[in-house]
């Protein structure tokens, strides 16, 4: 059977097209395979680089672990640019050389240094030692109490602003007038009148760092520990300046000195003397201020009350009727009241301090909850006052008075 010439030509052409298509398909497959291999090679290269980095890190860590520990020492004296006398932590003193990596200006008496185990050469200068207990006393987060949240203490707020806040915010005012701002302020008054609250408000209103110390924390068992902690607290305050140091319950460490020969009393007296020395060492126009609080001013040592230490002594007294009304307005601001005359409540709450009034508001709310009401009425406050007054009569407190006042 014979085919036309055109048909034969078409068959040949189709064969060539099919062959060309197969070749292109093979080329495309090969190119795709090459691309996949290149991508895989890149991934392997990246993994290789990452492994090399991890290997280098592990090698460095291993080298660190192989390095022998250094000996700690304290500089006693610098003989010349490259030699110094060091007291090692093991006991004896040594005349040692300085490493070329150590700046001779950093070698001062009292500096902490690291010594090589074999040659005892100084290889590193350490930062000044800080007591972890003093570092823990710094408050990182500001309290959420402002002066607007304190009622009945307008005169006291004005006085503490003049002593603490104004010198920190506007020191030029004192220089223009030509007077030295007070170094510190002592707050005294019955428990619950708002002494600690005022200190919190000062921390909130100023941008200064705030270091809070409780007097009993400064009383330590072993000789010199309390004095060292006092030094570290004041050193921390200077480094963090502008700073406010608040010493709560200062009577625990600043009580009158006696002739007692017991070891505990002598250690408290040493701590007090260190506190007096640190307060005298302050620059009055410096950015460090001291606030102290106590409810026993009668037992404080006269030395700490003299002008130049606590220049201004502020009494946080019992609030009067208007003061109690201001406090009640603050505490009842978010309370659901119906038919309550706060002026009448303030009259009924005679001889109550701010903490008592806050307790009255809380108790009034509890009485409303007990009766399954969503609002508080006048009878709730009357019952709350009777309840709180009964508690106060069981544990009454007579506020001692200062016989001599300074500032």
Curated annotation (Swiss-Prot):
One of its GO terms (biological process) is proteasomal protein catabolic process. ATP binds at residues 192-197, 331. It is found in: Cytoplasm. InterPro entries: 26S_Proteasome_ATPase, AAA+_ATPase, AAA_lid_3, ATPase_AAA_core, ATPase_AAA_CS, NA-bd_OB-fold, Nucleotidase_PAN, P-loop_NTPase. Homohexamer. The hexameric complex has a two-ring architecture resembling a top hat that caps the 20S proteasome core at one or both ends. Upon ATP-binding, the C-terminus of PAN interacts with the alpha-rings of the proteasome core by binding to the intersubunit pockets. ATPase which is responsible for recognizing, binding, unfolding and translocation of substrate proteins into the archaeal 20S proteasome core particle. Is essential for opening the gate of the 20S proteasome via an interaction with its C-terminus, thereby allowing substrate entry and access to the site of proteolysis. Thus, the C-termini of the proteasomal ATPase function like a 'key in a lock' to induce gate opening and therefore regulate proteolysis. Consists of three main regions, an N-terminal coiled-coil domain that may assist in substrate recognition, an interdomain involved in PAN hexamerization, and a C-terminal ATPase domain of the AAA type. This is Proteasome-activating nucleotidase. It comes from Methanococcus maripaludis (strain C6 / ATCC BAA-1332). The lineage of its organism: Archaea, Methanobacteriati, Methanobacteriota, Methanomada group, Methanococci. The gene is pan.
């Amino acid at each position: 059977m014979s085919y036309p010439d055109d048909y034969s030509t078409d068959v040949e052409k189709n064969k060539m097209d099919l062959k060309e298509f197969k070749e292109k398909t093979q080329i495309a497959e090969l190119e795709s395979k090459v691309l996949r291999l290149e991508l895989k090679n890149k991934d392997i290269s990246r993994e290789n680089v990452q492994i090399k980095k991890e290997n280098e890190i592990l090698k460095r860590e291993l080298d660190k672990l192989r390095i022998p520990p250094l000996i700690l020492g304290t500089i006693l004296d610098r003989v010349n640019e490259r030699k110094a006398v060091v007291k090692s932590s093991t006991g004896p003193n040594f005349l040692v050389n300085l490493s070329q990596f150590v700046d001779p200006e950093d070698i001062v008496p009292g500096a902490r240094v690291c010594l090589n185990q074999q040659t005892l050469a100084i290889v590193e200068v350490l930062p000044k030692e800080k007591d972890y207990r003093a570092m823990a006393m710094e408050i990182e987060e500001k309290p959420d109490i402002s002066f607007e949240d304190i009622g009945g203490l307008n005169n006291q707020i004005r006085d503490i602003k003049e002593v603490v806040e104004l010198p920190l915010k506007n020191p030029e005012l004192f220089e223009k007038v030509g007077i030295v701002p007070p170094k510190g302020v002592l707050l005294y008054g019955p428990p619950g009148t708002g002494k600690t609250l005022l200190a919190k408000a000062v921390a909130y209103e100023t941008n200064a760092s705030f270091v809070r110390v409780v007097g009993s924390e400064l009383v330590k068992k072993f000789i010199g520990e309390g004095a060292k902690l006092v030094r570290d607290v004041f050193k921390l305050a200077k480094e963090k300046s502008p700073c406010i140091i608040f010493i709560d319950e200062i009577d625990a460490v600043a009580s009158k000195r006696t002739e007692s020969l017991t070891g505990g009393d002598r250690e408290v007296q040493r701590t007090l003397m260190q506190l007096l020395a640190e307060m005298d060492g302050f620059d009055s126009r410096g950015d460090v201020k001291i606030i102290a609080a106590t409810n026993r001013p009668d037992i404080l040592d006269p030395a700490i009350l003299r002008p130049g230490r606590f220049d201004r002594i502020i009494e946080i007294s019992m609030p009067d009727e208007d003061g109690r009304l201001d406090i009640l307005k603050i505490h009842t601001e978010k309370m659901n009241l119906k038919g309550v005359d706060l002026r009448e409540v303030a009259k009924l709450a005679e001889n109550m301090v701010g903490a008592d009034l806050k307790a009255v508001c809380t108790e009034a709310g509890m009485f409303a909850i007990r009766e399954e009401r969503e609002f508080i009425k006048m009878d709730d406050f009357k019952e709350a006052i009777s309840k709180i007054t009964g508690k106060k009569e069981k544990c009454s407190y007579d506020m001692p008075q200062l016989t001599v006042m300074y500032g």
